[in-house]
Design a protein with these regions (language model features):
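Hydrophobic alpha-helical transmembrane segments
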Residues: 2-68, 76, 80-82, 88, ...
């Protein structure tokens, strides 16, 4: 139980620090909040709603991971370095993939809601 409490404290600190220092984290948190409301209108069912919100939470989680990668890379060497740039680009690509997944799920839900898909 003590480990769970400690892990929760660490997570809360990470969320707070992310909100304070990272515009991308704030942007994607707003996306989740807007999605919570918009999803109620678009989602064809409760299952679709859960999937839609789940994909937005995945985007936010991947952004936190990407932020961690960038912070660590900057700590290792604040100078420009080709390998560090590649590592940061991989993290950015992961965010792009998660955003693409969210877009696909949301567009599919909208198509189902509009009767364009079964």
């Amino acid at each position: 139980m003590k480990r769970l409490y400690s892990a929760t404290q660490n997570s809360i600190r990470g969320v707070i620090d992310g909100f304070k220092t990272e515009p991308a984290v704030r942007d994607e948190a707003v996306l989740v909040l807007v999605g919570l409301l918009l999803g109620l209108v678009i989602a064809p069912s409760g299952t679709w709603y859960a999937a839609m919100i789940g994909t937005l939470l995945i985007v936010l989680a991947v952004e936190f991971l990407n932020t961690g990668i960038e912070k660590l890379a900057d700590h290792v060497t604040p100078e420009q370095h080709s390998e560090i740039r590649r590592i940061k680009d991989f993290g950015s690509a992961a965010v792009f993939c998660s955003l693409s997944l969210a877009g696909l799920v949301w567009l599919t839900a909208l198509a189902v809601r509009c009767g364009l898909l079964g």
